Structures are given as C-alpha cells and as structure tokens.
Amino acid sequence: MRKILTLVSICLVMASYTTKAAETVRLSLFSWPGYGFWFIAKEKGLTEGLELDISIIEDPYQSFGLMTAGQLDATSSTAEYGPIAADKEVGIKLVTYTNPSYGTDKIILAPGIISAEQLKGETVAVLEGGLTQIFMAEWLRDNGVDISEVSFTNLIMDDAVGAMVGGTAAAAEFWEPFGSQVLEAMPGATVAADSTEEKYIQTAMLGDALYMSTAFIEGRPEAAAKLTRAYFNAVDFWKANPTEGNQIIAKGLNFSVADVEQVLGADGEILKGGIFVFDREQAAVFMGLTEGTLPLGIASDGMKAHWDITTDWWLKFGFVDRALPMETGVDTTPLRAALQ
C-alpha cells in the first residue's frame, strides 16, 4: 500500500512539473505564409517547452490592441508599426525584423488605368497604417501624384480583392497569393510596381517583424528569448526541410501548398517574386547587433533607415505626432538571447 501511495505521489509531482514546464505564450498572426513558421515551431517541438497558443487575426491593429490589453504576448505582422507604438506609448516593441518582401508585394492597377496620373480623384485600397499604404504613397509620389490627390480606403486583403474585382477601387496594393488572384480575375489589370525594385529591396522597406508586449519582455524575459529562438529554429527547420515545412504551414493556415510556395518557394532559398526569409544571423545584421553583409544589396544595420522612412510617412499621414528615435520602439534583448 505504501509503495502504491509513493508511486501515486511521484506521478502527481511529475504531472505538476509537466504542467509548470508547459508555459503558455499567446501569439497571433494573419493569414499569410510568411508568418507560418510558428506552426512549424509548434508541430516539431522547437519551442523549448513553451506552449504556443496561436490565433489567426486578420486585422493587425486588433492584435496590437489585444497586446496592449494584456491578452496577447506577441504577434507577427508587417514592420512599420514600431514608430506608431512608440508615439502612442502602447507598450509594444519590435523585437526583430524577419523577412523583406522580394516581389510578393505588388501595386495593381484596374483595367484601363495605365498611369498614376489617372488615379487622381480615384479610390485606392490599402491597409491604412500599414506598409501597403507606404508602398502606394511612395509609388504615387515617385510618379508625380500627391497622397492628397487620391482617396485611401482601408481594407484587409480579402476585401481589397473584392474592391478591385467589384470596381470600387482603381488600384490596390496586394501581397501574394492575393495579387495573383486579382490578376487572374481581372483581365487587363496590370502590375505598376513590385518589391523587387532596387529602392524597395535595398532598404527592405516592405517586410515583416516580430513584436512583443513590453510586459512580456520585461516580466517573462526567458520566455521572450525562448519564443524568439523558437521562431528562428522553425526557420532553420524550413530551410533544411522545405517540403515538409511548407506542408505544415499550409495546414496551419488552411492554404494550398501551391499558395505557400508562391510566397516562400519550394527549396528553402530566397524566392524572387516571394520573400527572403532571414535566419537569426541575418536578422542580427539587419538589426545592427552584428556586422556582416546581406544578399540582394540589403543594407546592413538597415532597421534604422527603415524606422526613419516609416516615421516620415506616418508624420505625413497623421498616424504619429512625434519623430522618435528607433530605441523607443525597438527592443532587441530577446534577439540577442536567441543568438546565444
């Protein structure tokens, strides 16, 4: 009897230990293959004991709001939110840049529109407060059209596709696979610009990042470091096993493997027309933590210039009131830990 009680006690202790070891981290992403590495980290057990509670939330500003409210710890999203978070003091930090767009982002014009000049007075679809708006604004300015001369409508990708096909938007910015869907559905629609162009790829202006709440970084620093390592562990797995990795991502997002490969490619390498997925060492170079060179002419220590470009545009659009230094919105502590 005593042996049975002892065995029961050991089992209870082990169960308690297991429960404590499975520390939960709540994170979100929206439906896009570039964020799907979290599904690899979870399925392949690359999280160092973290239990990833992954939510798909299509509006990134909803995710940021949940982070500020303490209901999310981290999110993968586009890389322009740092200056807004710093200006509004919402308790969110950009931890690392994760990938530049290398052709997946496109500005598409409706049939019959062949120049930026024709967009004056027209509606263009973007995600306001997102990089799609900056990309559109840069292209308009470069082609002689001021942002005040068009009407921006704020739409997530699915809705932007509907707006273009339905004729309520004369132009829009899309990433894949949504851009190809529009081109297929609208004979005569044309691509006016994409993110393979030198000014966009060398600055890595269009790309993605990992954000964490300040409360998470400061209150659970070991978990923040583990989460960052988990992401890059998943990237390493995908680079070594792209076929299996893409299948896991497709399942997690409920995408076809073909749609995933349209963004990530099939061989774990840089995909022209898709994205360039940074490993942890490349991310460290871009974030200014280590010295080195990056492919495609991407600037080393490029996050500083990226911050300045996005800040300038957010001042123009009225999303921020102050031009703050990068250090107010970026915390590379978890990335430093992930390098060790």
Model-predicted regions and their roles:
Residues E23-E176, S180-L183, G188, A192-D194, ...:
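Short, glycine-/small- and polar/acidic-enriched structural segments
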Residues M14-A22:
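Sec/Tat signal peptide C-region and signal peptidase I cleavage site
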Residues L7-A15:
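Bacterial N-terminal signal peptides
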Residues G219-K316:
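Secondary-structure end/capping motifs
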Residues L50, L94-V95, N246-I248, R322-L324:
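Short, hydrophobic secondary-structure boundary micro-motifs
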Residues E80, F152-T153, D159-A163, A169-L253, ...:
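Pocket-lining segment of extracytoplasmic ligand-binding domains
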Residues M1-I4:
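Positively charged n-region of N-terminal signal peptides that target proteins for export
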Residues M303-Q340:
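Conserved C-terminal helix/tail region of periplasmic/extracytoplasmic solute-binding proteins
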